């Protein structure tokens, strides 16, 4: 791989490419063109070629891309050969739904534990995942070597929990709360604001003719 910084927009598209390549591989297909890949993942072929160029020569002009080789390359790039243990913080409505989600699009992600304050849930096994009390969170994070946490708790409690997660050694947080959180530089936070996404979608529906496409 070339020694250079990969744009965030490119990094966000890599799982999309990988999942489609895996699907092609499962159906026995041997090669794919950038045009075919573009139509399937709805990313223009020029962007795909530019994304791939950050990783060196991945295909051959006039031939396309070898599905298995490209799939294996992105699997390694996305650390699909390493199991990442994930903790879920908050087993409310959204948290419960995420516990039921099997992360079927990746064999390398496993929610191994969950934490909550609700005494009716704590101590139970929900969809095969043990739910611990919040006071056990830091200890279990360390014992189970958790690197990533999903946050689905009330926004007012989020920063306090993030501070503890960072202290316990968590390196990445997927934040479903409305709070904008502060963490040490070595901890990455990715925000998923469902209300914001829905409001943005509604805006697009009503202002479609006014929008100008911007390339990420």
Curated annotation (Swiss-Prot):
Binding site for NAD(+): 90-95
UniProt-recorded Gene Ontology molecular function terms: DNA binding; DNA-binding transcription factor activity
GO biological process, one term: negative regulation of DNA-templated transcription
Claim: DNA-binding is one of the keywords in the record: yes
Major subcellular site: cytoplasm
Residue ranges of the annotated DNA-binding region, renumbered to this chain: 16-55
Record key words, sorted: Cytoplasm, DNA-binding, NAD, Repressor, Transcription, Transcription regulation
Localization terms from the record: Cytoplasm
Signal peptide span: none
Domain of life: Bacteria
Record has Calcium as a keyword: no
Pfam families the record matches: CoA_binding, Put_DNA-bind_N
Job of this protein: Modulates transcription in response to changes in cellular NADH/NAD(+) redox state.
Similarity field: Belongs to the transcriptional regulatory Rex family.
Name of the protein this chain belongs to: Redox-sensing transcriptional repressor Rex 1
Organism: Enterococcus faecalis (strain ATCC 700802 / V583)
Lineage of source species: Bacteria, Bacillati, Bacillota, Bacilli, Lactobacillales
Gene responsible for this protein: rex1
């Amino acid at each position: 791989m070339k020694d250079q910084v990969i744009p965030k927009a490119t990094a966000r598209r890599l799982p999309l490419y990988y999942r489609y390549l895996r699907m092609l591989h499962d159906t026995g297909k041997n090669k794919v063109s950038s045009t075919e890949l573009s139509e399937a993942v709805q990313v223009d072929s020029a962007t795909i070629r530019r994304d791939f160029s950050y990783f060196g020569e991945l295909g051959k002009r006039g031939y396309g891309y070898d599905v298995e080789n490209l799939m294996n390359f992105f699997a390694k790039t996305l650390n699909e050969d390493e199991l990442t243990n994930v903790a879920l913080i908050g087993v409310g409505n959204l948290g419960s739904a995420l516990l039921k989600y099997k992360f079927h699009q990746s064999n390398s992600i496993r929610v191994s534990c969950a934490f909550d304050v609700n005494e009716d849930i704590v101590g139970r096994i929900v969809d095969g995942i043990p739910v611990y009390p919040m006071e056990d969170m830091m200890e279990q994070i360390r014992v189970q070597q958790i690197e990533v946490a999903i946050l689905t708790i009330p926004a007012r409690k989020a920063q306090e929990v993030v501070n503890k997660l960072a202290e316990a050694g968590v390196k990445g947080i997927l934040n479903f709360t409305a709070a904008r959180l502060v963490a040490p530089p070595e901890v990455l936070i990715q925000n998923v604001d469902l209300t914001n996404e829905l409001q943005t979608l509604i805006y697009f529906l009503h202002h479609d003719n006014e929008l100008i496409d911007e390339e990420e």
